[in-house]
Regions:
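Residue-level signal for inorganic ion chemistry
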Residues: 32, 54, 226, 251, ...
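Acyltransferase
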Residues: 22-30, 59, 265-288, 312-317, ...
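Short helix-loop capping/hinge segments that flank enzyme active sites or metal/cofactor-binding pockets
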Residues: 74-94, 248-250, 302-353, 368, ...
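An N-terminal boundary/leader segment
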Residues: 1-56, 279-282, 445-446
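Immediate post-signal peptide segment of exported/extracytoplasmic ligand-binding proteins
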Residues: 61-78, 243-251
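Structural helix-boundary/capping segments
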Residues: 38, 116, 167-259, 271-280, ...
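Glycine-rich, small-residue loops and helix-cap segments
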Residues: 21, 32, 76, 116, ...
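Short glycine/serine-rich loop/turn segments
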Residues: 74-213, 256, 367-387, 417
């Protein structure tokens, strides 16, 4: 019999308990499926369950555990998947009515990899339409709840992914991040979110938004979980996080744009977190970086044309089926000139190189994950201008990491719905995770 506290254990802790024979994967999956069915918001979190698949995979995991043939720490651990990862024979609809009834024949490559590692697919979680909003509101399918405010949105676009973990309905979630879609819902639901470097993990079988920026990443209860699942998706050993310390680590607080129009609670929560990092031995510097400001200015020229080009043909067949603010945002990309788009990419490449030169020698650049708290869902529905303003504000800080091609880790600060982000150089995830686990410990210290 699986007790309630087990449902909120980290994925890594569950894996160790399975290895020790303390938890049976079949009983664990049955407990998660029962909890999802019984939860009053279960259908707002999960678009659909893969019940038969989950039970089959759990029985196979149980057999491997009994035979001493487990494939890794996550063997037998139940995960949720955002509804833009293809799942063979099960609908993958990307949060939009325009893809209703779309059933792929093959699993996404990353789902195949985690299945080979023994992880169990519980089902597909709700998301914002086409993954094109950071708020988590989706009036077309469902808007999952926020763990800290039942009237607020949960953050997006990996909204159901974060809710599935926060409400104890999955041990870990796999989401995607194009402009903040892993980190924002992680922050607003007091979880850990990892944005991986673009190109690090394969996108085969993942519904695209802006392919040059699309990334796969986990939302989890711990940094260790993020390290374990990233390693499993790459079929390699996880980095050794033991002994990580902040002593002597150099952090740069990114001033300027990340603090414009920041709300009081995120501002205070961030500064309290910085104080804790300093108390744990981190050396804190502060600076505004021209490369960041200039890269952000290019965002509308680069993002919106790429997103609109990706989905224009489908959207324009039935635009009335798309939530108006999402439709307007897509269409804002149709009037940019090709020469401006190309020139913007050339400039962005220069800004990326300049940023890396400006931040060389720092272990991480830190900033508030989001400058605001989760907005009220009803107001967002009723006031489309408010939706647009809050969406752009919500995504501003996280988009910095995407524009500059970085890997980024968002950690809970201890203040509800306030996250702190640590940014590191491209492909430096293992270093970031080692720094992150030490920061995680410092932030959890009273």
């Amino acid at each position: 019999m699986i007790s309630a506290p087990v449902m909120t254990m980290s994925a890594s802790a569950l894996g160790r308990s399975i290895a020790a024979g303390e938890i049976c994967p079949v009983e664990l999956v049955e407990a998660y499926l029962a909890a999802i069915s019984a939860h009053p918001d279960g259908e707002r979190i999960y678009a659909r369950l893969t019940r038969a698949r989950a039970l089959d995979e759990a029985m196979a995991a149980r057999g491997r555990a009994q035979a001493g043939l487990r494939r890794g720490l996550l063997d037998g651990v139940p995960l949720s998947w955002k509804d833009l990862f293809d799942s063979a024979g099960v609908a993958t609809e990307g949060g939009t009515a325009l893809l209703r009834g779309r059933v792929p024949e093959r699993d996404a490559e990353v789902l195949q990899r985690l299945t080979r590692a023994g992880a169990i697919c519980l089902g597909k979680t709700h998301q914002t339409e086409f993954a094109y909003s950071g708020l988590g509101l989706n009036p077309v399918t469902a808007t999952p709840p926020c763990i800290n405010d039942p009237e607020a949105v949960p953050g997006g676009s990996s909204s159901g992914a974060a809710a599935s973990v926060a409400f104890g309905l999955a041990a870990l979630a796999i989401g995607s991040d194009t402009g903040g879609s892993v980190r924002i819902p992680a922050a607003w639901n007091d979880l850990v979110g990892l944005k991986t470097t673009a190109g690090r993990l394969p996108l085969a079988g993942v519904l695209p938004l802006a392919p040059k920026f699309d990334t796969v990443g986990p939302i989890a209860r711990s940094v260790e979980d993020c390290a374990q699942v990233l390693a499993a998706m790459e079929n390699r050993p996880a980095p050794d996080l033991r002994g990580s310390t902040l002593s002597g680590k150099r952090f740069l607080v990114l001033e300027g744009a990340p603090f414009e129009d920041i709300r009081d609670v995120p501002a205070r929560g961030f500064e309290q977190a910085v104080d804790r990092l300093a108390a744990a031995g981190a050396k804190i510097s502060r600076s505004k970086l021209s490369s960041v400001e200039e890269a952000l200015a290019l965002s509308p020229i680069i993002y919106t044309p790429e997103c609109y080009a990706q989905w224009r043909n489908l959207i324009e067949t039935a635009p009335d089926l798309v939530f108006p603010p999402i439709l307007d945002r897509f269409r804002s990309g149709r009037d940019h000139l090709a020469m401006d788009y190309v020139a913007a990419w050339q400039s962005l490449s220069d800004h990326r190189a300049h940023y890396l030169a400006q931040t060389a020698g720092f272990d991480a650049v830190i900033l508030p994950t989001a400058p605001n708290l989760p907005p009220n869902a009803r107001r967002l529905m009723q006031d489309h201008a408010y939706f647009t303003t809050e969406n752009l504000l919500t995504l501003r800080n996280t988009r910095i990491g995407n524009m500059l091609g970085l890997c980024v880790l968002s950690l809970p600060t201890g203040v509800p719905s306030v996250g702190i982000s640590l940014m590191a150089a491209p492909m430096a995830e293992d270093h970031l995770l080692r720094v992150g686990v030490a920061a995680e410990t410092a932030l959890a210290t009273d």
